[in-house]
Every structure is written in C-alpha cells, then in structure tokens.
Regions:
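N- and C-terminal low-complexity/disordered segments
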Residues: 2-4, 17-59, 64-115
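Sec-dependent N-terminal signal peptides
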Residues: 4-12
Length: 115
C-alpha cells in the first residue's frame, strides 16, 4: 500500500512539472518559434535578446530589435502584439505602453543570441 501511495504521489507531481522548465515557466511555443526565426537570420548587431516580464498582471516577452531605429516589441503569451515600449526614431517606441518602464517587472532573460 505504501509503495502504491508513493507511486501515486510521484505520478501526480511529475505531471505538475510538465509546464515548468528548470523551475521556470516553459516558453510558449509561439515565442519559441519567433526565437527560432531569428536564429535563421544572420546574427544581429547588437545580438538579439528576449526577456520575460510581468506587465499589468500578464506574462509578456520583450524582443530587442536589430537596429536602433526599430521598435523593441512586446508580445503576450499567445504572440499577440502588445506594444513597443522603446526604439524607433524617437527612442520612445510606439507610445502604446508609456508606463512599461515603470510598471513592468523583469522576470528573466529567456534567450540571448550567443553565436
């Protein structure tokens, strides 16, 4: 009976870990696809980075751009465009989330192009 209980506990807890990656939430597949697309291109200068943030109670992903005059774009977990908090000619992004700098909390660096 004890081994059955232990087996059941192991089974149930292993299912809870499938959404985690090294103790962190798994990268959504659409975000991974965006990263994979960048990997197919020549290395950017500066190198591409993807950061995970918590913004307005949502999990979002900040993609750096490959040039100073392009927007640094933020996408939600479903790859819906949220805003561009920085970049562009003005450096202030698209002005759709002017509070990003103050309200967004960085969770982690998800990926950096180390090629």
């Amino acid at each position: 009976m004890k081994s059955l209980l232990v087996s059941l506990v192991i089974f149930l807890t292993s299912g809870a870990k499938k959404c985690k990656e090294d103790g962190k939430e798994k990268i959504p597949s659409c975000i991974q696809q965006k990263i994979d697309q960048i990997k197919k291109e020549a290395k950017w200068n500066p190198p591409a980075e993807v950061h995970e943030y918590s913004y307005n109670g949502k999990r979002v992903f900040y993609f750096t751009s490959n040039c100073c005059d392009r927007y640094n774009e933020v996408y939600d977990e479903n790859c819906n465009y949220v805003c561009a908090p920085s970049g562009g000619y003005s450096g202030k992004g698209d002005m759709k989330c002017p509070d990003f700098k103050d309200k967004a909390k960085e969770v982690r660096l998800v990926w950096k192009d180390e090629r």
